[in-house]
């Protein structure tokens, strides 16, 4: 998987908002907000996409476990749920 280019993560109060930088990426009917953990995962996914051209659920799980004290099963569950929401929002590609 890889993130779609052209999105920037912005912090607004206690939440993070994903903003499309070009008019073709902007959908005025929905706003994509992340909590701190999802924002961390997005930043990792973007970094991996730039560096290697892709990211995997396993790599995000490893990054999540390195950053936060979370059990492997919970980390993978959180990552899979987050990736599913990104697919639904159409901000990643297979």
What label would you give each PLM region?
Residues 1-44:
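Acidic, low-complexity/disordered tracts enriched in E/D and polar residues
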Residues 30-94:
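Long, charge-rich, low-complexity alpha-helical segments
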């Amino acid at each position: 998987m890889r993130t779609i280019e052209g999105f920037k993560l912005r912090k607004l109060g206690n939440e993070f908002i994903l903003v499309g930088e070009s008019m073709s990426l902007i959908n005025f009917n929905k706003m994509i907000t992340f909590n701190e953990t999802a924002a961390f995962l997005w930043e990792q996914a973007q970094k991996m996409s730039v560096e290697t051209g892709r990211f995997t659920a396993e790599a995000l799980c490893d990054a999540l476990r390195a950053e936060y004290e979370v059990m492997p099963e919970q980390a993978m569950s959180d990552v899979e749920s987050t990736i599913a929401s990104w697919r639904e929002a159409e901000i990643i590609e297979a």
